[in-house]
Amino acid sequence: MGRITSSRSQLIGDPRHHSLLASKFINCLMLDGKKTTAQRVFYDALEEIGKRHEGEETPIEVFEAALENIKPYIEVRSKRVGGASYQVPMQVNKARQQSLAIRWILAAVRDKKGRPMALKLADELLAGFKKEGAAYTKRENTHRMADANKAFAHFAW
């Protein structure tokens, strides 16, 4: 008998760019069901990126590239073997890569204080695009942990 899988709800692209990724990001950015506020913050951040970025990429391309740069490809997971817990490096599937990248960006932005959310988000996305910033550092630390625990890779299940 096969495992029953739940069906995922269909995501509709965001109103301006028709991007599923942007829509997902806005949903994660939203607090207390205030989607309009989350959209305003996201689009203001994209406008700020448009003003600050001197390249041929559009702001939505900068956003997508930043997210791509922050996605982790490998992470460590705890596995118990004979009374000891090992940090086993494992590959991350696409959906988890995306959700981790979004969560790390938002955590980095929410940790910064004293400026409007849209400006902080624009800063972090531009930093991610340039392979810098707190979210990118988090990704690098995750990869470093996996590399340090390579000896336990044979425990992968």
From Swiss-Prot:
Superkingdom of the organism of origin: Bacteria
Pfam families, per database record: Ribosomal_S7
Record-level GO cellular component terms: cytosolic small ribosomal subunit; ribosome
Record's keyword annotation contains Transcription regulation: no
Presence of the UniProt keyword Cell wall biogenesis/degradation in the record: no
GO biological process, one term: translation
Molecular-function GO terms, alphabetical: mRNA binding; rRNA binding; structural constituent of ribosome; tRNA binding
CDD domains xref list: uS7_Bacteria
UniProt keyword annotations, A-Z: Ribonucleoprotein, Ribosomal protein, RNA-binding, rRNA-binding, tRNA-binding
Function, as annotated: One of the primary rRNA binding proteins, it binds directly to 16S rRNA where it nucleates assembly of the head domain of the 30S subunit. Is located at the subunit interface close to the decoding center, probably blocks exit of the E-site tRNA.
HAMAP family in UniProt: Ribosomal_uS7_B
Quaternary state and interactors: Part of the 30S ribosomal subunit. Contacts proteins S9 and S11.
Family to which this protein belongs: Belongs to the universal ribosomal protein uS7 family.
Listed PANTHER family: RIBOSOMAL PROTEIN S7 (PTHR11205)
Protein name in the entry: Small ribosomal subunit protein uS7
Species annotation: Rhodopirellula baltica (strain DSM 10527 / NCIMB 13988 / SH1)
